[in-house]
């Protein structure tokens, strides 16, 4: 598809639904000359965003690489949950590779053309959807293992790998609209942007493509997690399963951090949707408030990609031991120092899979 030019794009098509869509998590273009409300969200913050993106990129690159290394190094004792967490680390690492590009675009505008616009936008979408879908899979796995305390077909590792592959496939399908409609756009008197081009049906399709992915890629998996963890926690507390409860701390922390990072963005996006459909009256003040909120919550969502390894380092005893074991094997720390670290015993559930490498 050729790069988009402003001459073929009508005012109504663009500003008629001048939205912060994109379940893709990135902010809309700032078109000061074509909007009746002067945007106040990005101009003064571009360098703050740039620095934040670069820091998240470096932390995510290091942290998720270490997580993958530890899990793969311990693959002989790798549990079902570890397979899911490995895929989470892969998703976050892939997303981190796009952050330098997004950081540069915040300062200089989108100067990378349409092909790269499509690719990096697709990676962002797939990262988000795969993250919440894999967390939903973990919640179902823990629900079956603890609440029903039975070994199920889902515990077989080759089937778990198939489930992970399926989640990647679903994430890709949910992200296809971004691949199809994203283009480099060159508005007059403004920096180029990476944004949706849907022709004469921009307003209609943008709302459809906002609601459907939000329903199937966020709300439904969130309800699954809520159901599973409510009953899982109830079972743990009723049975006084202290050891299993401690083994679940890492998983609960991962889910909680995901929600803390992404729920604010989705709530702001919901508010923006209500404003676009005139359920909430739109004013210049409210529009700028929404733009600023999306700016801030997007950064919070991006921050998530580097937080899981930090959780593992502070809460996951087995992750710390596994990392020290790798360092000792390569002579980077003494074996005497490793011996001082008592390896925590693996906690076995009825399904044999409550323990994780992390």
Swiss-Prot record:
Bilayer topology annotation: Multi-pass membrane protein
Localisation: Cell membrane
Predominant location: membrane
Residues carrying sugar: 8, 20
Post-translational modifications reported in the UniProt record: Phosphorylated upon ligand binding; which is required for desensitization.
Keywords: Cell membrane, Chemotaxis, Disulfide bond, G-protein coupled receptor, Glycoprotein, Membrane, Phosphoprotein, Receptor, Transducer, Transmembrane, Transmembrane helix
Tissue-by-tissue expression: Expressed preferentially in neutrophils.
GO biological process: calcium-mediated signaling; immune response; neutrophil chemotaxis; positive regulation of cytosolic calcium ion concentration
Residues in compartment: Cytoplasmic: 74-82, 141-161, 230-249, 314-358
Membrane-spanning parts: 47-73, 83-103, 119-140, 162-181, 207-229, 250-271, 293-313
CDD domains named among the record's database cross-references: 7tmA_CXCR1_2
A single GO cellular-component term on record: external side of plasma membrane
Extracellular side: 1-46, 104-118, 182-206, 272-292
Pfam families xref list: 7tm_1 (PF00001)
Cystine pairings recorded for this chain: 117-194
GO MF annotations in UniProt: C-C chemokine binding; C-C chemokine receptor activity; C-X-C chemokine receptor activity; interleukin-8 binding
Self-association state and partner proteins as the record states: Interacts with IL8. Interacts with GNAI2.
UniProt similarity note: Belongs to the G-protein coupled receptor 1 family.
Protein purpose: Receptor for interleukin-8 which is a powerful neutrophil chemotactic factor. Binding of IL-8 to the receptor causes activation of neutrophils. This response is mediated via a G-protein that activates a phosphatidylinositol-calcium second messenger system. Binds to IL-8 with high affinity. Also binds with high affinity to CXCL3, GRO/MGSA and NAP-2.
Name of the featured protein: C-X-C chemokine receptor type 2
Annotated organism of origin: Oryctolagus cuniculus
Gene name tied to this protein: CXCR2
């Amino acid at each position: 598809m050729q790069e988009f030019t402003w001459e073929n794009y009508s005012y109504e098509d663009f500003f008629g639904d001048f939205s912060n869509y994109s379940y893709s998590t990135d902010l809309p273009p700032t078109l000061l000359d074509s909007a009746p409300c002067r945007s106040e969200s990005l101009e003064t913050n571009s360098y703050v965003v740039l620095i934040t993106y670069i820091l998240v990129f470096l932390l995510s690159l290091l942290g998720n690489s270490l997580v993958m290394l530890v899990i793969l190094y311990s693959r002989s004792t790798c549990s079902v949950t570890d397979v899911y967490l490995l895929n989470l680390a892969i998703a976050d690492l892939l997303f981190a590779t796009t952050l330098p590009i997004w950081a540069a675009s915040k300062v200089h505008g989108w100067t990378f053309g349409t092909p790269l616009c499509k690719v990096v936008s697709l990676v962002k979408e797939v990262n988000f959807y795969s993250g919440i879908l894999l967390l939903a899979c973990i919640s179902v796995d823990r629900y079956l293992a603890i609440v029903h305390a039975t070994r199920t077909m889902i515990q077989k590792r080759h089937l778990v790998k198939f489930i992970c592959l399926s989640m990647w496939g679903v994430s890709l399908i949910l992200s296809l609209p971004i691949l199809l409609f994203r283009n480099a756009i060159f508005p007059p008197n403004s920096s180029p942007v990476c944004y949706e081009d849907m022709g004469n049906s921009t307003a209609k399709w943008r709302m459809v493509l906002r609601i459907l992915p939000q329903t199937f890629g966020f709300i439904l998996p969130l309800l699954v997690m809520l159901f599973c963890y409510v009953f899982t926690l109830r079972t743990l507390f009723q049975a006084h399963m202290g050891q299993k409860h401690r083994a679940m701390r890492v998983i609960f922390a991962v889910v909680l951090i995901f929600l803390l990072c992404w729920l604010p963005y989705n709530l702001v996006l919901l508010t923006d949707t209500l404003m676009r459909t005139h359920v909430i009256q739109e004013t210049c003040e409210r529009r700028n408030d929404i733009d600023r909120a999306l700016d801030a919550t997007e950064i919070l969502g991006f921050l998530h990609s580097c937080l899981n390894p930090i959780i593992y380092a502070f809460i996951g005893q087995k992750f710390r031991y596994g990392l020290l074991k790798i360092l000792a094997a390569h002579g980077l720390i003494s074996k005497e120092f490793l011996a001082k670290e008592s390896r925590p015993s693996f906690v076995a559930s009825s399904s044999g899979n409550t323990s994780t490498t992390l």
